[in-house]
């Protein structure tokens, strides 16, 4: 028996009928760029997360680039990020000519260390990117206080934390802009690349909306520098179906995580990353610390367990 890290087929069976029906409608309508499905997705996301604005984009990486551009990040600016994160957190900054500055993370939970962050702030610092790694969250209130005091933009890289709670609110509510990824393996995943930006600030939303589509105010009328970062309409159809079962999916993942914690917590050679008391994780990943990662991965592979 092979145990996969993600079982996409099982998830597909839960949405099969509704998805195939809506895809057929889309193909008959021949509307593949933005349109009704994308508008519906953005409405569904705002309702689910209780945010004012949602913007579908082409990937989680593009979501970060759009967010940074909307915040005016430019060449030689500095943006502080945790030193344990996915490469896109850093590369999105570098693609704009700015510099990612690495702050330490807490060894027990993998989130950005507040004191290390404070020590990295200088005159060139323009923004902080917080990362909800593996569904766990940093101390967003402390980060918000620091960013407000120092007049910095606070961006949430929530690629792995869609649906995670910070003190009874979804984590996408606490920052200037929050981003997520709908990569297939995510808690809310598409069947290709897709992502989204969220904000409660109208000016940032309107700027991001222009950036998403070549800086256009309207068709063929570009007013600022922009990207081709529109979400694929077919992927919007997929996510519209999957969001109907997202709460069930998060509950299922959390139940599986609890089984891992219960059955493996007595093994002294294995340590789990701690879930912070103010966080309710979306169950994105089960992450453990071991002395010899490569040896342990090899053993799990021999047992038919993907990592």
At which residue positions do the language-model features occur?
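Hydrophobic/aromatic ligand-binding patch that stacks against planar heteroaromatic rings
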Residues: 92-93, 146, 170, 187, ...
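PLP-dependent aminotransferase-like
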Residues: 69-158, 165
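Structural detector of well-ordered beta-strand residues that form the stable sheet scaffold
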Residues: 55, 80, 101, 154-155, ...
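Conserved SAM-binding loop
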Residues: 56, 81, 102, 197, ...
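N-terminal "arm"/small-domain region of PLP-dependent enzymes with the aminotransferase-like
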Residues: 1-31, 36
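Phosphate-binding glycine-rich loop
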Residues: 30-78, 92-96, 102-104, 169
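Conserved active-site segment immediately N-terminal to the catalytic lysine
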Residues: 156-191, 206, 218-223
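PLP-dependent aminotransferase class I/II
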Residues: 9, 21, 36-44, 48-54, ...
